C-alpha cells in the first residue's frame, strides 16, 4: 500500500493528531489496520470497533499489541454493536472515522462534540443527510463523495471483490447466469460490470430514472423488481438502503435463486424473515439453503451481511483500491485538524 505508507512516513514526522483521541468504526481487517497504523503514527490514541461479522480477530490482536484499544471480541452478538458505539462515544473523541454514521450519531449528544469526522459509505451519507439533517454541529467529510473513491474503490474494487467472493463461496460459474443487481450507484455499476465480464446476463433494478437510463446505455437490461426477480438466478443488492428485497419478493423468485448483499446494511435483503419462515441449512461456511413452504429453495450468503467481507474467506476489496480509499480517510482527518 505505497500511498498509505507514504502518508505514515509524513505523519510520523508531522504528528497531526498528537494528543488526540480518534474514535474508529470500520471493518477491522489487514488493510484497515494499516490505516490505524497511520493514525497511531500521527500521534493519535485510537479506540476501534468493527462491523458485525467482518472483524478479523487476528488483525484485532495485532492492533491491540500496537496500542490501539479494540472493543470487538470473538463470539459477541448483535447487541455488542450498541454497547461499543456507546463506549467509543463516551471517550469524547476529538475525531471520528465512521462507517455507516452510527458512531457520528452516538456522538451528537456529547458535551464536547468532535472537531470533525469522516464517513466512508453511501449508507452513512444517507443517514447523515436524512436522519441527522440539521443535527450535526461539526464538519463531516463523506469519503464516498470523492470521485477517486467512487471510481477506484466502489466501482472496480467492490465490483471485482463481490463477484469473486460469490464465485468462491458457491463454486459456481457466472456464465449465462441471470444476475439481477439492485442499485446502479458506483458499487452497483461495478458489480454489474464484473458479473457481465464473467459471462452473466445482467439486469439492473434502479429507482432513479437517470441511473436507470445510464444502466440501459451501458448495455444492461433494466426492469422493475417484480419483473426482474421472477427470472433471477442470482440477486445482488447494492443500494445502501434497508428493505430492498422483502420476504414476499423472495417467495416469488425462481427455485434455486441465490441471494447476496453488497451494501453496508445487513437488512437490504430480509434474511431475518427468511430465517423465521424457512430456517437455513448450512451447506458450507457462509452458504445456506432455505426450503420455502411453496416448495422452492433459496440460497443465501453470509446471512445478508456485506458479502465480500462477511463471507467465509472474504478479504474485501483489492489492496490497490483500498490503498487510495484509506489514504483519503487519513488525509481527510488531517485536513480537519489543520485545514
Can you name each region flagged by the protein language model?
Residues 26-44, 49, 157-160, 164-242:
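Glycine-rich phosphate/diphosphate-binding loop of Rossmann-like nucleotide-binding domains
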Residues 95-98, 111-125, 250-291, 299-300, ...:
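ADP-ribose/adenylate-binding Rossmann-like module
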Amino acid at each position: 500500500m505505497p500511498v498509505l505508507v507514504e502518508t505514515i512516513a509524513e505523519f510520523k514526522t508531522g504528528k497531526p493528531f498528537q494528543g488526540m483521541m480518534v474514535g474508529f468504526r470500520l471493518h477491522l481487517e489487514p488493510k484497515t489496520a494499516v490505516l490505524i497504523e497511520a493514525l497511531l503514527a500521527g500521534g493519535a490514541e485510537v479506540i476501534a470497533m468493527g462491523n458485525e461479522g467482518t472483524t478479523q480477530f487476528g488483525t484485532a490482536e495485532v492492533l491491540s499489541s500496537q496500542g490501539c484499544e479494540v472493543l470487538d471480541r470473538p463470539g459477541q452478538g448483535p447487541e455488542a454493536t450498541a454497547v461499543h458505539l456507546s463506549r467509543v462515544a463516551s471517550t469524547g473523541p476529538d475525531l471520528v472515522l465512521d462507517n455507516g454514521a452510527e458512531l457520528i450519531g452516538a456522538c451528537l449528544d456529547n458535551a464536547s462534540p468532535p472537531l470533525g469526522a469522516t464517513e466512508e459509505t453511501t449508507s452513512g451519507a444517507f443517514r447523515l443527510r436524512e436522519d441527522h439533517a440539521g443535527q450535526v454541529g461539526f464538519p463531516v467529510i463523506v469519503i464516498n463523495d470523492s470521485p477517486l473513491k467512487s471510481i477506484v474503490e466502489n466501482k472496480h474494487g467492490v465490483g471485482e471483490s463481490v463477484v469473486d467472493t460469490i464465485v468462491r463461496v458457491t463454486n459456481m460459474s457466472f456464465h449465462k447466469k441471470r444476475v439481477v443487481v439492485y442499485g446502479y450507484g458506483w458499487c452497483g455499476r461495478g458489480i454489474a460490470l464484473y458479473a457481465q465480464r464473467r459471462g452473466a446476463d445482467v439486469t439492473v433494478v434502479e429507482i432513479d430514472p437517470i441511473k436507470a437510463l445510464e444502466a440501459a446505455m451501458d448495455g444492461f437490461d433494466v426492469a422493475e423488481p417484480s419483473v426482474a426477480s421472477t427470472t433471477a438466478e442470482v440477486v445482488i443488492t447494492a443500494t445502501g438502503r434497508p428493505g430492498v428485497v422483502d420476504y414476499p419478493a423472495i417467495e416469488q423468485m425462481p427455485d434455486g435463486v441465490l441471494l447476496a448483499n453488497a451494501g453496508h446494511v445487513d437488512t437490504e435483503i430480509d434474511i431475518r424473515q427468511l430465517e423465521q419462515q424457512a430456517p437455513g441449512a448450512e451447506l458450507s461456511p457462509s452458504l445456506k439453503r432455505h426450503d420455502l413452504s411453496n416448495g422452492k429453495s433459496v440460497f443465501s450468503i453470509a446471512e445478508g451481511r456485506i458479502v465480500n467481507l462477511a463471507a467465509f474467506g472474504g478479504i474485501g476489496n483489492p489492496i490497490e483500491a483500498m490503498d487510495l480509499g484509506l489514504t483519503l480517510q487519513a488525509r481527510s482527518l488531517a485536513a480537519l485538524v489543520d485545514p
